[in-house]
Swiss-Prot record:
It catalyses: FMN + ATP + H(+) = FAD + diphosphate. Its cofactor is a divalent metal cation. This is FAD synthase. ATP binds at V10, F11, H15, P16, G17, H18, D97, Y124. Belongs to the archaeal FAD synthase family. Homodimer. The gene is ribL.
Amino acid sequence: MGKRVLAGGVFDILHPGHVAFLEEARKIAGKNGELVVVVARDETVRRLKRTPIVPEEQRVRMVSALKPVDRAILGHPRDFSITLKTVKPDVVVLGPDQDIDEKEVERWAERAGVDCEVRRIEKYERCPLDSTIKIVKRVIELWKRGELRV
């Protein structure tokens, strides 16, 4: 029997790291399980990280088109426990580079009345452009060298 797995992130510029994370989350869900991906709202990204490059509606559309994903939703802008209460996952999966602490997710789940396991994916195959910031830096580098044309 499969599990309902919740994975989340910004997914601003999709890259192989995102795909590897979601493939691992899918494995945890199992063949008959469900992978629900919560995409951070623009407001949340601005508050916690930076200004998003790609608007939330486009990010959730791109994530929903990925093969491992059964359903992609926008998260609650201020309270992750509301998202947990809505989705009711069996497992919440965190990526290796996500700054959130597992214990904090457990507290949110408890507040939401959701009994779920929290797992962190420790590693996945790394590649040179496996983060949004690395991609942005590469674009800037190519632009400065005159190798990109608009």
